[in-house]
Amino acid sequence: MVVTAAGSAEEAVRRWVDAAGGRLVLDGGLATELEANGADLNDPLWSAKCLLSSPHLIRKVHMDYLEAGANIIITASYQATIQGFESKGFSKEQSENLLTKSVEIALEAREMFLKEHLEKSTPIQHPVLVAASLGSYGAYLADGSEYSGDYGEAGTKEFLKDFHRRRLQVLAEAGPDLIAFETIPNKLEAEAYVELLEECNINIPAWFSFNSKDGVHIVSGDSLIECTTIADKCAKVGAVGINCTPPRFIHGLILSIRKVTDKPILIYPNSGERYDGEKKEWVESTGVSDGDFVSYVNEWCKDGAVLIGGCCRTTPNTIRAIHRTLNKSPNKQQLPAVE
């Protein structure tokens, strides 16, 4: 089931939420799941490396999440930038084509998923959406600054706008349902995104998701409430929330977000494991199990979250458990029939 966007960004997101019965399930970790399927991501391009080496694996992971119950799959473009591809020797045109390819792969996965279920006489009755991921400047640097928000001398709004502008345009032109501004580490980059959405006249609903280091501030130390207010004032932002943050912080963060916005709230935490930015590896035995992760879900729903999924180190099993939990929720609306 494909539900098109119309009206304001917030209205579009609310319509998708309603069509799903009151909650939308996001997918889980992409890069870590690609590694689990045999991909070597030891590269500054991270998951975007698979756009070059193994696009079939990206498609497989998208399909795995759809089969697990995800309503939204997020493209393999979080760390894909024109500048990053050019540093690997690609032309600007080739770099833009790779960005487009990230969206095309997700759209293909959706088409395959819907077709397979139609052929099995089990047509999908909920929205299936593609969100084009746009990671921060820090994600491009691949030096851990996406987890600190400290960009040094590069940290000016005009620099960040110039860095992201063409990338945003290319991703939007590829035809996703949403633009996902993910793991936003500082207030300045949020302001840059808002101005770009207006200047580029992007008419695809966007979401802003920040990451928090302590349950109060985003990772730069900027106030989450101030950052949420920036998103709230932008009509092109349809939802706002948190990603890549330990589950234990989410309850308080949702309550903070609700103080300053009525937009739909999205939550997709990581597994709770700690990432060592210098060693570029996850520290073992610092996270929670799928069962513990999912135990938070009903609380987050009561707090006001309506889009829920997982980030780094979560898997299709995590998303399957979230899907089952939400479908058992007493607040779950009856799914509408497809006309």
UniProtKB/Swiss-Prot annotation:
Query: Amino-acid biosynthesis: present as a keyword of the record?
Result: yes
Q: Which reaction equation describes what this protein catalyses?
A: S-methyl-L-methionine + L-homocysteine = 2 L-methionine + H(+)
Q: Quick one: signal sequence residues? A: none
Top-level taxon of origin: Eukaryota
Q: Name one GO molecular function term.
A: zinc ion binding
Record: residues binding Zn(2+): C244, C311, C312
Q: Does the keyword Transferase apply?
A: yes
Q: What class of enzyme is it?
A: transferase
Where the record annotates domain Hcy-binding, the positions are 12-326
**An example Gene Ontology biological process:** methionine biosynthetic process
Sorted keywords for this record are: Amino-acid biosynthesis, Metal-binding, Methionine biosynthesis, Methyltransferase, S-adenosyl-L-methionine, Transferase, Zinc
- InterPro entries xref list: Betaine-hCys_S-MeTrfase_BHMT, HCY_dom, HCY_dom_sf, Hcy_S-methyltransferase
What this protein needs as a cofactor is:
Zn(2+)
- The record's EC number reads 2.1.1.10
- Matches recorded under PANTHER family: HOMOCYSTEINE S-METHYLTRANSFERASE 3 (PTHR46015:SF11), ZGC:172121 (PTHR46015)
Purpose: Catalyzes methyl transfer from S-methylmethionine (SMM) to adenosyl-L-homocysteine (AdoMet). SMM degradation (by HMT-1, HMT-2, HMT-3 and HMT-4) and biosynthesis (by MMT1) constitute the SMM cycle in plants, which is probably required to achieve short term control of AdoMet level.
**Quaternary structure note:** Monomer.
Q: Would you tell me the protein name for this molecule?
A: Homocysteine S-methyltransferase 2
What species was this sequence derived from? Zea mays
